[in-house]
């Protein structure tokens, strides 16, 4: 029975089951967000880099740092072509290793509801986002129609 269990910390399982949703909804989310070009991005909970790839391919960022707590997922992300343009790191969203006001845009795609201390993670996102920057994300709306819910804040 244990062999049948797949975890999303396993990058291959994530890519197979969730990657297609991340691509589909991520495109809608980035259209909704309408980010400026040449921004400094932080992608929280990047997994295998599916959403990060959308950022790089559609938003013309100046820089992108993408973090995830799962080493296996980051290993897969680092093997992708976008890795040349992205700094992929294994990090904890609740203890970000970046200076205050480092990023123009901080995003989280289908992740915030899985973080154990969401308040701390959001506080960290606010800390590393520059004044007048954007913090945004989307999650599944489990209470209503199970579709995506988007939200953003400007610092």
Give residue ranges: language-model regions:
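A short SAM/SAH-binding and catalytic strip from SAM-dependent methyltransferases
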Residues: 104-118, 141
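Conserved alpha-helix/loop element of class I SAM-dependent methyltransferases that forms part
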Residues: 20-39, 54
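N-terminal, positively charged/glycine-rich alpha-helical extensions of SAM-dependent methyltransferases
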Residues: 1-11
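Conserved class I S-adenosyl-L-methionine
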Residues: 134-155
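A generic alpha-to-beta junction signature in SAM-dependent methyltransferases
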Residues: 33-35, 59, 81, 129
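A short glycine-rich, Lys/Arg-flanked "PGG" loop and its adjoining helix->strand segment in the class I
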Residues: 119-134
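Class I SAM-dependent methyltransferase SAM/SAH-binding core
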Residues: 40-96, 120
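A short acidic, Gly/Pro-enriched loop at the edge of an enzyme's catalytic core
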Residues: 94-105
């Amino acid at each position: 029975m244990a062999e049948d269990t797949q975890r999303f910390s396993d990058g291959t399982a994530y890519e197979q089951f969730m990657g297609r949703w991340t691509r589909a909804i991520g495109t809608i989310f980035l259209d909704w967000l309408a980010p400026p070009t040449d921004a400094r991005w932080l992608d929280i909970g990047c997994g295998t880099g599916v959403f990060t790839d959308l950022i790089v391919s559609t938003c013309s960022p100046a820089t992108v740092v993408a973090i995830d707590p799962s080493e296996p997922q980051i290993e897969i992300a680092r093997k992708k072509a976008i890795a040349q343009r992205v700094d992929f790191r294994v990090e904890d969203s609740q203890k970000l290793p970046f200076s205050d006001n480092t990023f123009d845009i901080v995003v989280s795609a289908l992740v915030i509801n899985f973080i154990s201390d969401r308040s701390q993670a959001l506080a960290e996102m606010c800390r590393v986002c520059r004044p007048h920057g954007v913090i945004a994300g989307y999650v599944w709306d489990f209470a209503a129609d199970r579709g995506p819910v988007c939200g953003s804040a400007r610092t």
